């Protein structure tokens, strides 16, 4: 994801397994899976539009965890209160540091987002069973806004007045970082001249 005014990029589709795994458990239809996937993308993209996680020393898998939680909650049919608690549980327990993607990269780089998905589904399951989370996790004096991002509003979500962010999806031509796409195209063109 690289929205037109995004402060962070990343892969919102990393959150799709939350809808798939919960759908199997809950025995829901493909419609619910698609809805959960769109919700995951929308939440991730809205966070990426507002929070430059990398600049603050954190990893984008925080957004994957929160997006996965929202997706799982929707597919599981959780109430608004249960969903709020699930999001609080995930956010309180899944603050991933940015070092997982920089320097000498370990195997954990490939697991950070998957761990966020797992934690999102687990938090939704806990909330469904009545577990509560710190509901002031975003705006409390020691919360997300204070410690990570500064205050922000997510803005209007996709629907009647605003297009869904998933409609801005793009595909990479090559399995390399987005900033290397044009360089690789040039290399392939030059290769035939050598």
Predicted regions: what is each one?
Residues 2, 46-56, 96-104:
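Glycine- and aromatic-rich loop/turn segments at beta-sheet edges
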Residues 1-7, 51-52, 168-169:
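Active-site flanking loop/helix segments enriched in acidic
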Residues 6-13, 33-37, 53-65, 109-115, ...:
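Active-site nucleophile and cofactor-binding loops and adjacent substrate-binding regions
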Residues 1-46:
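Hydrophobic alpha-helical hairpins/lids featuring a short glycine-rich hinge
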Residues 62-65, 70-194:
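Functionally critical mobile loop/hinge segments
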């Amino acid at each position: 994801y690289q929205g037109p005014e995004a402060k962070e990029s990343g892969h919102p589709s990393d959150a799709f397994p939350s809808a798939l795994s919960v759908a199997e458990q809950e025995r829901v239809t493909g419609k619910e899976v698609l809805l959960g996937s769109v919700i995951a993308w929308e939440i991730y993209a809205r966070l990426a539009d507002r929070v430059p996680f990398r600049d603050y020393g954190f990893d984008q898998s925080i957004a994957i965890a929160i997006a996965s939680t929202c997706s799982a909650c929707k597919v599981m049919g959780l109430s608004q209160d249960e969903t709020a608690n699930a999001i609080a549980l995930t956010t309180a327990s899944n603050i991933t540091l940015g070092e997982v993607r920089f320097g000498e990269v370990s195997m954990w780089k490939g697991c950070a987002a998957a761990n966020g998905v797992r934690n999102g589904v687990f938090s939704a399951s806990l909330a469904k069973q009545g577990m509560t989370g710190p509901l002031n996790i975003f705006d409390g004096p020691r919360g997300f806004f204070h410690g990570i991002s500064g205050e922000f509003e997510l803005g209007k979500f996709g629907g009647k007045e605003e297009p869904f962010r998933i409609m801005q999806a793009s595909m990479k031509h090559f399995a390399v970082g987005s900033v290397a796409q044009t360089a690789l195209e040039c290399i392939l063109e030059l290769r035939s001249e050598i």
